[in-house]
Design a protein with these regions (language model features):
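Helix-to-loop junction immediately C-terminal to a conserved catalytic motif
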Residues: 30-73
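Short, basic, glycine/proline-bearing loop/turn elements
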Residues: 43-44, 110-116, 146-147
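Structural motif corresponding to alpha-helix initiation and N-cap regions
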Residues: 56, 101, 123-126
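Catalytic core of membrane glycerolipid acyltransferases/transacylases, capturing the structured
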Residues: 26-27, 63-120
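Hydrophobic/basic alpha-helical segments enriched in Actinobacteria
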Residues: 51, 60-62, 121, 184-186, ...
């Protein structure tokens, strides 16, 4: 192969790489505080909108200040869809065993995920989430606690969402994930093409002494039952 041909190929690769980086940078909408994290944000939005045909308006977040974003949990694709519909970074509470997955651990740490130990008292995670809300951040969680497919009976909501809403005074913004082909799967759901939809609902506010009613209403909203 001639030097000229090798040079032309190298120039073409560099050109394609630069074009891709510009495309990712133009697609990102949330500022994660770093060039590469913002590029990943752009990649995720393209993936969810093109491959998973995501239908969703931007989540109705306040321009500044805290909020809790909560959703039903049907697959490992759910958090990617929520990020793709958010104009602000989301800090997810995730299970400790998921947080410690090889390779992904560095990414989870970089985007501020908060690990929750499910085998013991989750107080440390709740306090970390409360501090994030006090700093004006957006915290996202799945109050059912684990993945639940539509054919299973509803799971009772974890009371941590009520604690965070009460302690921070932040609005709770419910979402319902629908149209996922890979229900019940984690990594596999990301690569099974879906017609994903995020349904938005009005914010909820927890009033003093109203925890049970709040959780019941949130359960109905997330499950549609």
């Amino acid at each position: 192969m001639s030097v000229a041909l090798l040079t032309a190929a190298a120039v073409a690769v560099v050109g394609l790489w630069r074009h891709l980086m510009r495309r990712l940078e133009s697609a990102h909408e949330a500022d994660w505080g770093g060039v590469w994290l913002n590029r990943l944000d752009g990649l995720n939005r393209i993936w969810c909108r093109r491959f998973h045909r995501l239908r969703a308006e931007a989540i109705g977040l306040p321009q500044s200040g805290p909020a809790l974003v909560v959703a039903n949990h049907v697959s490992g694709l759910d958090p990617l869809l929520m990020i793709a519909a958010s104009r602000r970074p989301l800090r997810f509470l995730i299970a400790q065993e998921e947080y410690e997955r090889p390779v992904l651990h560095r990414l989870f740490a970089a985007i501020g995920c908060i690990p929750v130990r499910r085998d013991c008292n989750p107080r440390a995670a709740m306090e970390a989430a409360r501090r994030a809300l006090e700093c004006g951040e957006i915290v996202a969680l799945f109050p059912q606690g684990r993945i639940r497919v539509g054919s299973e009976p509803p799971l009772p909501l974890k009371r941590g969402v009520a604690y965070l809403a009460r302690a921070s005074g932040a609005p709770v913004i419910p979402l319902r994930v629908e149209g996922i082909r890979g229900e019940g799967r984690t990594i596999g759901a990301v690569f099974l093409r879906s017609r994903a939809r995020l349904r938005h609902f009005p914010p909820l506010h927890l009033r003093e002494g109203d925890t049970d009613r709040f959780l019941h209403r949130l359960q109905q909203t997330l499950t549609g039952q």
